[in-house]
């Protein structure tokens, strides 16, 4: 199931400049979602991170992965209309950088949902190379 920006905005509350997912390419509610961020030189964060060698902050990549996971969790029938909050992060590793011109593949697999909590395994990659891996916890409210 492909979702454009307008469909994403119906599911999660994030808006520009903090909506970090351009589209969802594939999604199974409560199971997984794959989204993309097409990074341009005009992203606000590049003005200060770093002017001589622009690099997308790793924590923003983690946030983008969390947004993709939130789309998967909040698309479950019982969670529609709710909000997914960032509850925690474990086993996070930064393995590469993201630069202007990169198309970042963001995949979050939901490995557990119990009550108001969910856990996802998240991976960001550029050109098939993993740049970030993390386990994310979501609080659903």
Regions found by a protein language model. Give the residues of each.
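Hydrophobic beta-strand-centered segment that forms part of the acyl-chain substrate-binding groove
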Residues: 1-2, 69-105, 131-139
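Short aromatic-glycine motifs in intrinsically disordered, low-complexity regions
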Residues: 5-15
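Beta-strand-rich interaction surfaces with strong enrichment in secreted/lumenal proteins
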Residues: 9, 52, 94-96
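HotDog/MaoC-like acyl-thioester-processing domains
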Residues: 13, 98-102, 109-141
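Catalytic strand-loop segment that frames the active site of acyl-thioester-processing enzymes
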Residues: 16-56, 61
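Hydrophobic core residues within well-ordered beta-strands of beta-rich domains
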Residues: 18-20, 104, 118
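Conserved positions in beta-strands of structured domains
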Residues: 22-25, 90, 95, 109-111
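Active-site helix/loop of acyl-thioester processing domains in fatty-acid/polyketide metabolism
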Residues: 24, 56-79
């Amino acid at each position: 199931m492909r979702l454009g920006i307008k469909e994403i905005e119906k599911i999660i509350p994030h808006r520009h400049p903090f909506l970090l997912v351009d589209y969802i390419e594939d999604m199974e509610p409560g199971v997984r979602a794959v989204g993309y961020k097409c990074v341009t030189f005009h992203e606000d964060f590049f003005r200060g991170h770093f002017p001589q060698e622009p690099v997308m902050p790793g924590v923003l990549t983690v946030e983008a992965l969390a947004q993709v996971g939130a789309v998967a969790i909040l698309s479950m029938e019982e969670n529609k209309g709710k909000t997914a909050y960032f509850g925690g992060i474990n086993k996070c590793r930064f393995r590469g950088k993201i630069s202007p011109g990169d198309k970042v593949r963001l995949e979050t697999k939901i490995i557990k949902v119990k009550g108001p909590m969910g856990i996802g395994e998240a991976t960001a990659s550029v050109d098939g190379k993993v740049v970030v891996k993390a386990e994310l916890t979501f609080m659903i409210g």
